Amino acid sequence: CGIYMVEYVMLENSSGYTDKYEICKSITYKEGIKKGGTQAMKILVTGGAGYIGSHTCVELLEAGYDVVIVDNLYNASEKAVDRIGQITGKTPTFYEADIRDYEKMTEIFAKEQPDTVIHFAGLKAVGESVRKPLEYYENNIAGTLNLCKVMRENGCKNIIFSSSATVYGNPAFIPITEECPKGVCTNPYGWTKHMLEQILTDIHFA
């Protein structure tokens, strides 16, 4: 009942709080992420054609995972998917789709039956979020809720969520640790990430 594996992936911002490449490696080699036996785990990566997403897909493919990319190409290009194939010698399955599209996401999950989702998809510009708060709340929060609903309906209980250092607002201290207070965000983008952390935590404990 609900999603039982939730991880927050803190991404690098202008202050360089976290190293993105090391995050990709830690995701790839995390103990327990592979299936038993010889069958490769299938991982669906939302926003997989973006910068962080595409680098993560390279690491996953090179580690032997099956990768399915879902990206609406709002801030990415299908050329990134081609480049992933060139780098790894393996072609990931790609769907141009929006995570808010319930019917399309249901179709993808029914066909692919992923074991795990790594969730990068979402609007991500701090300044733009101040000008377009409705778009950010609708895209990031409603999109993730739709994704979680489709996951539940298809028996996929593992999600790794890409959060952001913006959840700390103006941090109480630097360098930031997990003990740093959260929830005093300074922009709508940060609030979407903070709210989603809470939503996923609630789903985890349901």
Pin down the residues of each PLM region.
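Short, Lys/Arg-enriched N-terminal segments with co-localized hydrophobic residues
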Residues: 20-40
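Serine residues within intrinsically disordered or low-complexity segments
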Residues: 14-15, 26
